[in-house]
Curated annotation (Swiss-Prot):
Keywords for this protein: ATP-binding, Coiled coil, Cytoplasm, DNA-binding, Nucleotide-binding
Gene Ontology molecular function, alphabetical: ATP binding; ATP hydrolysis activity; DNA binding
Job of this protein: Required for chromosome condensation and partitioning.
Residue span(s) of domain SMC hinge: 525-620
Compartments reported by the entry: Cytoplasm
Protein name, as recorded: Chromosome partition protein Smc
Amino acid sequence: MRLEKLKIAGFKSFVDPTTLPLPGNLVGVVGPNGCGKSNVIDAVRWVMGESSARHLRGETMADVIFNGSSTRKPASQASVELVFDNSSGRAGGEYARYQQIAIRRQVARDGQSSYFLNGTRCRRKDITDLFLGTGLGARSYAIIEQGTISRLIEAKPEEMREIIEEAAGISKYKERRHETEQRMRHTRENLERLADLREELGRQLGHLQRQARKAEKFIALRDEERRLKLELLGLRWRALERQLDRLKAELTDSEERFRRLTGEEHACETQLEGLNRLRGVAQEKLDVQQGRFYELGAEISRLDQFIRHTQKSRAELVQERERVEAELRKVESDRDDDRLRLEAVRAEAAELKGKLASLEQEVAEAVSVRQAAEAKLKTCREGWEALAGDRHRLEGQAALQRSRLQQLREHGQQLGGRRQRLLQQQSELEKALAALDVQAHRLEVAGIEAEREETVGAVEALAREAERQRDRLRFARERLNPARAGLHAVQGKVASLETLQRHAMGRDRSAAAAVLEAWQLSAADRLGEKIEVAPGWENAVETVLGAHLEAVCVDSLAPYLANLQAQEPAEFLALCEYRQGPVAEGTGGPRLLDYIRAPLALEGLLAGIYCASDPAEAAERARSLQPHESVVTPGGFRIGKGWVLAQKPDAGHAGALARERELRECRRRVEELEAQCRILEREASEAEVELERLESEGREARKKADELSAGLSLARSELAAAEARSEQWRHRLDQLSHELNELADQELELAEKRAEAEEALQTAERDSLRLQDVAAQRKGEWLALEEAFAAAEAAEKSLHEEVRALRSRAAMLESNAALTAAHLQRLEQQHGQTADRLAAIVQRLAESQTPLEDERSRLDALTEERGVLEAEMARQRRRLSELEADVRRVAGERQRAEHELAALRESIGQMKLAWQTAEVRRQGIEEQFAELGAAPAAVVAGLPEDAEESAWQASVIRLGEEIERLGPVNLTAMQEYQEQEARQRYLEEQDRDLTESLATLEQAIEKIDRECRARFKETFEKINAGFQRMFPKLFGGGKAALELTENNLLSAGVSVMAQPPGKRNSSIHLLSGGEKALTAAALVFAIFELNPAPFCLLDEVDAPLDDANVGRFSQLVKEMSEKVQFLFITHNKATMEIAQYLAGVTMREPGVSRIVTVDIDAAVELASV
């Protein structure tokens, strides 16, 4: 598998379609820096599947597209193609039979890449699979870029292992292992889902089994809870009695102490008022004195500041006067010096003017002499140079014509040989084209494509339908589980409510049950079960009816009256007759019957009972009632003519009507949920059956589609290869015909050029001999004129220097005179200004003396007055401090009394509140005892003295939690249990199948691991041996080796040890850049020696090497080229010498790279002719 050519278009700087042929095993790429040589390496890496823009020296994948230049627009897409010669059949699998393999990658501005294999669109994975085990890849050891040769040897042990694995061909095994692990992961996920389903199913089965046992505990726990609650009430009542006695004694003591503290507080307030009045008077007197003190202080401060400021100003004026007098004396001295200096400068300037005029006349004469000599020299030089130029031109023309004749002779020989080769190729291609049948391949591809498209369409339709069925199944299961959970919860609630309601309706009374059983009325409805009460009036109805809620509903009372008279009295037995006629309307306002709906004759029980919204309205309406009538409120308060009844329903019937309404609602909800579950179960079952059918058909269709895809890929590859060969051969025939015609024209043109060159050579040789004699004569004349011109130029230069010196001196004198005059004028002005300033200073000193004495006298008087006032203020402050101390002491005593009163008042309030709270709680407990029909004293008498409420409370809570933990009871669990058990058996079969599949996959993993271990060990040992042999060869000595970081061959990293001759370094990182590069080269060549990749790309690997190492490196590359094809980029001439074929990358147009190729062997052969 050999790389034939590289085609680039629009990739980075290669904007034009460019082909780089690779005819030999040593191809060098040369060119200046920045011309695009490394873009060739990037192109190869990119087309082989590189997906990281960073490894291509870019930020995004679109950066590889030519981005435009000063003269070019940006390209719309980039394309790179590699063409391989696979005549050796090294490409594995289905590609082994192709003589030529072409892979191409192109990318547009949107960053999406497309891959093509022999002209057929494919995936990136297909490209990487093609190179698995060959040593090639986007980041393989066969591509070594700038700077990476050293990083290769410094790679981490894990990264170095990947290189050894690629050399061992393990990558394809690892890919298979990865795919097997994915299948194992999917299998484990399915097992986990099955385990979750089985676990959930197991929980449901256990739940159904447990529900039957829960009902047995309910009654026993309820009775025990009632007993403990009654005893707990007794404990609380006894504790409240003791608390009330204690609070009453504490409250009496606190009230006595409160009266005593109130008297103390009043005495403190009276004393505090007298002290505050005295403190106010003292404070006012001190404020007046302090105000006067501040006024005196301010005036004294002002006078003191004024005196200091005046004294400072006078001192500054004296200093200023002395400084001005000194300045005036200096100005007068400087003025006299400048007058003398100005007279001397003017005299010297007049003398220089005479000398300068004489020298300027001499300079004019010297310039004339020099110009005449220069003109003669120029004329002579131009004549001699013209003759010399003509002679050299004629000699160059003669040499050019000789070279041209030699090239024309060689070119003629080449054209003759080329004609013979082209005629032979033309004959061979015509025969091959006649034998190639492309149409048969096209018909085969069309047939497979049509069948595959039909199969793919069927697969997609089946997949869509299967997904729809999965959604349907998932949706049904998602709805079924909550529905089942809701059904179980409601069924449990129904069972609990039925148990409670059975007790409330008296169905568990044994004596009455025997009578009803004898009368065949055990299953008859009870009054509380047949009536419906308007919301809010349940308490009122329960209060009025009481035990009559347990009445048995019968069609007629007549058959049972005689039996009742003869029967033994039961604990309670009531009968109620169904309504036989219409209900009479009431006349005294809303009746309780108006809030009840029932098919029963309730007029006898509820006649004359009216309704009111609250007790006040009931009392108002009771005034107009008849003796047998009464009014009841929603809360159960009942009032009649001359009587009032305030009671709650008895504990057995409390909430029975609301519970009955809730029970009817729950039964209706159970029916709805059961219907919903049946519908959802049917939908889920239908979806599962349909999904299994669709998945089976989909697998068969996908299998057929895969087979057709493989066949289509093979057929397309064969068609593409045939079409490519046909197109290539036809194109080559056209090229050959065109080249033969061009050869005939070139041979005619070559003969004409040869005759022209011979004639031009003879003419140039004759003219050159004639001009040689004339040029010698002109040379002597030119030398004599040069000497005369040099003498005139030196004389002129000397005079010019003297004139410049005199002019410079004159200019300097004029400048000095002007400066001195200006300075003298400034000194005169400064003298007058300084004298005026001195007079003003003397006058100001005289004027400031008198005010200073007056202010000093006034300052002494004010200071004495402030001292007297300060002593008086100190006495007043001491008096005020004594009064404030007394105020603070009395205020502290009052505050202490207030705090004690506040705390005591709050304590008394809390004790009263606690007493009231305890009293209310005791009354509440006594009411609860009354409702339960027990006396507190009797219950407490049966309790031990050390009984603690917390223990009884914990027992009640424990029993409540046990009852709560029982949850609802499900009476329909058997059928569901059988259904779920059958489903569990099906899931267990699925689990066994998946477990067996997982075991098979694990065996496959073990087999792959064994193969990988064996291959890795063998490859590591061979590469290590080759590395140990290559290293001394490159370094001229030393030693190197590869070492494993651990014993596990599946995970062990690989480290590199290298010691050049004479060194004992402990780490590879201590080597120089050149030594690292040579060590990495030795390792790469050892890998290539074991498993040579089809080609190797080296990008300036020799850059860090010196000349001796470059020589050894080049010789080793040349030896390795017998097995491996090398494409190297270099700037080193020694490396270029080993190349069989040179490709030069140029950038004549800014930003655009082009390739110029040279066959070195052909060039050497041509040069030797």
